[in-house]
Amino acid sequence: MAKKSMIEREKKRQRLVAKYASKRQELKAQLASAETQEEIMSIHRQLQRLPRNSAPSRLRNRCWLTGRPRGYYRDFGLCRNALREMAHQGLLPGVVKSSW
């Protein structure tokens, strides 16, 4: 199980990404249509003033059950350990053991 502080930090990042998504998208659109070097530099400065944790690239996928950051399966939102346990218990509809 991941530390509570790491899970909360990740939740805070998700809130910041959602809060600043429109502002960031607007600035990037302005950057694409900017013509002069001064405009480009000004827009870059505005982007740099946004909180660092509001960048989507700083998000890390975590298991919703354990908070584990590695071995994450997007389809389920679970890490491999939790996925295995829940599949064995029959808690994931449509998931069956493979046999060939």
UniProtKB/Swiss-Prot annotation:
Domain of life: Bacteria
Listed SUPFAM superfamilies: Glucocorticoid receptor-like (DNA-binding domain)
Gene Ontology terms: biological process: translation
Gene Ontology cellular component terms for the protein in this record: cytoplasm; small ribosomal subunit
Keyword flag Translocase: no
Keywords, sorted A to Z: Ribonucleoprotein, Ribosomal protein, RNA-binding, rRNA-binding
Gene Ontology molecular function terms on file: rRNA binding; structural constituent of ribosome
Family matches, as Gene3D superfamilies: 1.10.287.1480
The keyword Glycosyltransferase is assigned to this record: no
Cross-referenced PROSITE patterns: RIBOSOMAL_S14 (PS00527)
Family classification: Belongs to the universal ribosomal protein uS14 family.
NCBIfam families, sorted: PRK08881.1
Subunit structure: Part of the 30S ribosomal subunit. Contacts proteins S3 and S10.
Function (record text): Binds 16S rRNA, required for the assembly of 30S particles and may also be responsible for determining the conformation of the 16S rRNA at the A site.
Annotated protein name in UniProt: Small ribosomal subunit protein uS14
Gene it is expressed from: rpsN
